[in-house]
Amino acid sequence: MSTQTAFLRRDPMTVEPWRETCGQIRCLIEERDQAAAEVHHVEIENAKLHYHQRTDEIYYIIDGEGSMILDDETIEVHKGVVVYVPRGVKHKAIGRLTVLTVCIPRGVLNDVYELE
């Protein structure tokens, strides 16, 4: 059995936010934590259409309502909805949304290809 720490606790309010492709982001579990995935708390704001070559994303809508563009389709989203975005799918969230994104595998911040 490993002696490595088996857990990580991080409060979003203690993490310094910065502007990224989707809006204001706080990395709760990041690449340097060596977990299997990254977890980000994102305030959607002027998001840009983009895709990832190596990363799948799961969006959990914490608060708000809006829509998401997924390739050529637009879907409605609201608090409590989960959206799975496979790698290669062009996507963009629209509206006043607070989301939790789970990015698998880790390293998504080096795997963003903006289209606008």
State where each predicted segment sits.
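A cytosolic small-molecule/anion-sensing beta-strand core signal
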Residues: I62-D63, H78-K79, G95
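Short, conserved beta-strand element in jelly-roll/cupin
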Residues: V42-E45, Q53-M68
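Short acidic-glycine-tyrosine-enriched beta hairpin
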Residues: D72-G88
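Short hydrophobic/aromatic-rich beta-strand segments that constitute the beta-sheet cores
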Residues: Y51, M68-L70, T101-V102
